[in-house]
Each structure stands twice: as structure tokens, then as C-alpha cells.
């Protein structure tokens, strides 16, 4: 591997055989890092997404889809029919010179054409073969059809979204398919990291169901600890021009509430017992929202956002796609980029999902169908099989073998992150074999740990509701998100604590933190300081708004990110207000992407010998889930809104009641064949000839009638039974599962998705693992989350060489220890 100014993947060739959303999104990210991506499309029709709304111009030509244009930037397009043997052989020849192949066909289809992993890897042992499918390559559902709404249902993300008295609701747009693509990207980068080190390629198995089960970061663990999942009303209040989330129930510093009261012109409420503490404000949320709503009704939403953020609250506002393009933070960071289009003029695209040193993110216009046939098919085919670097041979490594050692063995991570996004990223690193040292302060523990001692009205979830003697070691979120980590405490405000921190920096490869913009700089421990201590260190900064810009010090929660990134503006019932997920959806998305960003930074270090700063904005990443709507608005001026559970291209597409209390099934029919299958499954084949439902447009126009017909059938059966009956007829469908149901789902069990953890203080529970399976780099077993400071002596003594007596003295001084500061 050699360094290049053209991107960390400039030496990598990618063959993109995928269609739709997830696989192409994965390949788009690889192209953004500099890889040459050759997209193979069917002649005439092209990728299925070329026919997906919204369209940038009149008609639905193959060059007009905003979705295709967004997903396929910086790629080359060739047309080949895989069912024609000569053309399949051309694909096989292309694969011989390929580093990464991405595909999304039904399991077994490419194998039947001689294009499966086993066949292609014989000629190209270093090939990384990424399969992205609804249910993965194994398990009883592997041949089932999927889609965005099906994955949200079967992965339990959907169950807690929406209002208590209505059907569960999907996250708007194609966001889940995008997240599946991000998982594929991160897994591909992991496999490339292994190949760079060991020489062999492997098969990467990505299942949208796995990804969504990872993404429901509350339900599965909370239900095991005795918490009942619910759909909750929103906490939004109406501003003059939209909606805001005041953010006064959590994350508010002591002393802020009186300032807010003064600002709102109600100073008398500063001492009102309903609102004086965070717990009181949570208990009296509706009264609080009434007070704030009266004040907010006459003010613009962004003014409220900036005013309250200046008081250190975690406030959000529901940004529309139109708002995003003029949001001052995104404009200042030049997140959106304009690309020329020969037909539609200038088209605005979301830019880089993360920033790595001064490396540019490659963003070029999407290809026209078959644009590169002459260059690739007529000019390049016939090139010799790839010559692997001699260094691999000299090292005596077999390209086809596996070492059976953990993928990230020898990599050491210092983890300062809290809450969800950062801990999720480092949890994945631990699962793949990295040594992760979680660093906290006794006075400022990870928020996931909760309280220093038991107390009343604690909103966190504990096993069977019992806080225990050490509640900080047994909260659901702590034990779930901090698997496979060591725990160390240091007071970073103390000179000795800073000295020891820099000592750890010198022996670590990666630092991960997700504080507000300038926190580490104020401590004197920002990137300049740590890179001076260790020039090879990779510093991953995950922040709400990014490391730069006028809002760099603004805070957020997953729910407010859904608002400011625009996701809430396209999520909701058709006749209602914007809604957020109850799974803080941006956090797992960012956690999964952060893993891939680190793999890219490690490859850059391999090339240059130097570490770097990786700047990842959670708002920017989340806004990428609305990519096609951004493009559409920039050309047509259309502002995307909520569609409930409906879809632009499919009908029927919704969630339907089943037998039992609050039981549901998600169903989507995107083709005439799937519609016919649905008619057969419900025992009404005559509907296939009904003029009201003759094509997708007719079915969309009569969606309400269809919903009644389908609901009358689904009500009489169990949600799993409905799913299986529909899938047997080739209809995409998924039971809307609770988190507790995913734990016993036979497909996830067959895929080995869950690990059983026996935590010394929280008991036995099932743990989510990783959103990928690598054929030669298995994940490591889950090791229970550590108690606070459990490894102080092991790490400070073993890594830094401190004698036990000195660590004892540090405990006496309060610089380290295994019990919280009483004020925590």
C-alpha cells in the first residue's frame, strides 16, 4: 500500500453489481475515498433505482432519478446482462482485477451464474466480496424479500415509533436502507484492513435485519430488564414557523432554568417546584411544554434554537430540506456540494460523511447508463490478472487462508466517548478484537452509568427496576453499550491526571471522544496536544455539529439530531406533526459509520506513517439519510414531507393490524408480480384484475381501499403467520417485532446474532453484537461491561508501569478510583 493524494482508496478497484439503495450507497462511500468503482447495470433498464421517484425532470427517464443520482456519484457505468453467458464471463474477468465486489442479488443467484464468492475467489484470493441482502446469506429467512419498511418492522425499530393509539410508524424515506449501506461500507473497510495486514480476502455478509436489530439500541435490552416498550407522544412545541424541541427535561446544567425563565418572561417560575429540577420537569412535562409553547408561538424556530443553545440547553428545531441548505452551520462547513448535470443544471448533493486530515472527498456526477462501455468493456477487458504486491509473498502469507486471529488484534483504543454513538463504535471495535480502554472521571461518569448512589425517580432502566448498591455498574444502557472494554478512571482536570492521560495516549493507536466542540481543547488535551505526544495517533472526534463552525459547541441528543438534520420532517403520519424515533436513531447510524471512518484512517496511517484527526458531525451524517430529497429540492423546489407508512414507488405499502394486542405486520408490494402474490395470499385473486388496482399508480390512488382490504385479512392471524404466508407468495412482509421478540426470533438465532452475557451485577441477558459477518474474521465473544475503574491497576500498572503504591496514592488523592465522587 502506498500513499496517494487521490484518496486513501486510490489503489482500490471496486466492482458494483448491486442495485437499489444499500449496495450502491456502500460503493458510493468507497468511491468517495478514491476507489475506482465500476457499476455493472442491466442493458436498457439499468439499476432499479433509475426508475425511483423523485425525478429531477419531466417523465421518468433513466437519467432523471434523484435517488439514483445521489447513490451513484463518482462511479463508472457499464451495461452487461448477467444471464447471457458471454457477458457473465466479462463480469468474471472484471472480478479478477477487483479488490472489492459489492452485490445485492438474492442468495444463490450469482452462484448459479458462476459469479459467487467461492468461484471468484479461486481466481482472485484477495477478493473482498460484500453481499448486501434483506436477511443475509444464512438462516430460515435468507430467501425472503425485504425493503426499508420490512427491515424496520422485523428489526424492532418501528414498534416504538408513532403515537400510542395508532399503528407503528416507519422512519421516513429510505433511511434504513442507507444505514444498511453504511454497515456494508464499514465492514468492507474492516475486511480491507485485514487484507492489508494478512493478505487474504473474504466474504462479507450484510443483513438489513441484523443492522436494524443493532440499531434498536433501547428496546431489546430495556425489555429484558423489565421495561415495557411504548409509543410516546412528541415533546415538540409549535414555533412561529415550525416546530422546536425545548430540551429542558434533560441535559440542562444546574442554574440554567432560572435563566430560561427570565428569557421567557416568567421569572416567577424559577422557583416553581414543578420545574426546579430535571426530574421535576420530566414529571411535569406537559405543563412545561405549555409554558414554553406560549413563549415560542411568536418566535422563529431557528431563533429559539440558537437562543436556548446559548444557555447550554439541548434544544432542537425541525429542519426541512429547504432549511438544511441554508443552515448556517452546514453552510459554514461547506457540507453541501454542487455538481453539474447536462440535463438538470446544477444539482446540490450532501458532501463528505467525515473529514480526515486534509484528504478530499471525491464527489463527481453520476454516470449515464453505459457511459463507460467503450473505456471498460472494449478498452480494458483482457488486462492481466492482478499482480499482488511482492511484500505479501515475501511475508509468507497465504492469500486464501485465515489466521483465525481477531481482525483488530493489537489495536488499542482509548475511549472517552459517552452515551451512544461513540460507545457503539468502540463496542464494535472490541467485538472485532481491539483492546478498548474506557476512560471516565469519578466526578463525570459516562451518562449511561446514571447515579453515584440509589435515589428516587431515576429514569434509567435497571434489572427488574432495582438500582442495587452500585447503580452505576448495572444500568441497561451501560451494560449494553460497553461490552468488551476495560474501565479506567482519571481526573483530567488535575495535572497528574493529564500526565497519565498523555501517557496512555503514547501507547494507544486511537482516541475516541464525543464531547462538545472545544471541551478537550479547554482541558489542554485537544488534537494538537495529543498528536504531539503521539504523532501516529488517530483522533476520532464525534460531535453533534462537527469540530468547526459557529455551532461547534452546540449539544444534541439523538432526538434533536433527527430534528436538526431533517429526518423528523419526513417522519410522521400524513395528517400529523413531525415525529422522532424512540431509539435515538442517529446514534447507532453514527456509531456504525465511525467504525468505517476509523478503518479508513488506519489505512491512511499505514500509507503515511502518521495519525490524523477524523472530524465526524452527527448532524451531517444524519442528513445524508435524506440525500435524494436534497437533490430533488435543489432542482425542483419540492420540499419532502411525511408520508406515514406509504411509499413513493410502491402500493400497497403499510402496517396492518394482526391478531393480539398491538400486533402488526408490515407489507409492501412494489411490482405487479408482488401484487398478484398478495391477492393470492389473502384468497382474493380477482383483485388482480380489478381496474382500481391495475398498476402501481392505480393502487397508490386507491391506497385507502387497499388498506381496508388487507387489514380485514391480517386481523385474523398472528403477525408471524401473516409474514410467512405473504413471503411464500413472494410478497415482502415482516412482522412488527418488539425488542423482546427479536431475542427469540429463529432467524437471528440461526445466524448467531445474539451473545449471552452473565454480568456480575446486572445478571444474564442477551446482547446485540455486530451488523456484519465476515467469513474469515469472526467477532469475539461478548465480555461483560466493566465496573467503574475495574481495571485501574491493570492499565496504569501494566501499560504505564506505575507501582501499586503510587496507584494507591492516586486513589487517596481522588485522581483515580472505583467508586464515584459523591457529587457525581
Feature names for model-found ranges:
Residues 1-200, 223, 368, 372-610, ...:
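N-terminal helix-loop segment corresponding to the beta1-alpha1 unit
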Residues 347-385, 765-804:
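C-terminal active-site "lid" helix and adjoining low-complexity regulatory extension at the edge
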Residues 168-179, 231-234, 243-248, 276-279, ...:
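A short glycine-threonine-serine/GTX helix/turn-capping micro-motif
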Residues 181-202, 214, 218-224, 259-267, ...:
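Oxidoreductase and adenylate-handling cofactor-binding alpha/beta cores
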Residues 44, 134-136, 208-213, 241-243, ...:
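Glycine-rich beta-alpha junction loops
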